A protein has these predicted regions:
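Short, Lys/Arg-rich amphipathic alpha-helical interaction segments
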Residues: 96-98, 102-144
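Short S/T/G/P-rich N-terminal loop/turn motif that feeds into the first structured element of a domain
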Residues: 1-93, 100, 104, 134-144
Length: 144
């Protein structure tokens, strides 16, 4: 079964239908390919680059666009194991990116410079989850 690397059209349309003028936080869960899967014709095709190295290239090359739209990474964790969920599900990277509003995220993913750099992410990722959240003030107990 192919992993989720890029959003489906219906998912992206649903994202765009949500409010665009409020802050958002995006939970990223990423499972990497052992070897990056660059397409033929890409300068890194066949070089034996790891998925992690390709993802780091994505992070480095897209950082200027991410910063330009006002994005910032607010949490990073190293996944250690699944406590609840499919036993065979694992993630290599986990982080939350925050944007001043959904419009900033849309500006980033449609930016021509970013679209060139995202090829590293596409080569790096075997499977991923990207989940949008509206930031809220935490309460005293779980779910509050």
């Amino acid at each position: 079964m192919a992993g989720s690397i890029d959003p489906l059209r219906a998912q992206f349309d649903a994202f765009k239908a949500l409010p665009r003028d409020t802050p958002i936080q995006m939970l990223n869960l990423v499972r990497l390919n052992a070897l990056a899967a660059y397409p033929e014709g890409h300068p890194n095709h066949g070089k034996g680059m790891s998925g992690l190295d390709a993802y780091r290239a994505y992070g480095r090359t897209s950082a200027a666009v991410f910063k330009r739209v006002g994005g910032r990474q607010i949490w990073v964790g190293e996944p250690e194991g699944v406590v609840t969920g499919p036993a065979d599900e694992h993630w290599d990277l986990a982080f939350i990116a925050e944007y001043p509003d959904a419009g900033a995220f849309l500006a980033m993913v449609t930016d021509p410079e970013y679209r060139e750099h995202v090829k590293h992410r596409q080569a790096a990722v075997e499977d991923s989850r990207l989940i949008r959240f509206a930031p809220v003030e935490a309460g005293e107990g779980f779910g509050e």
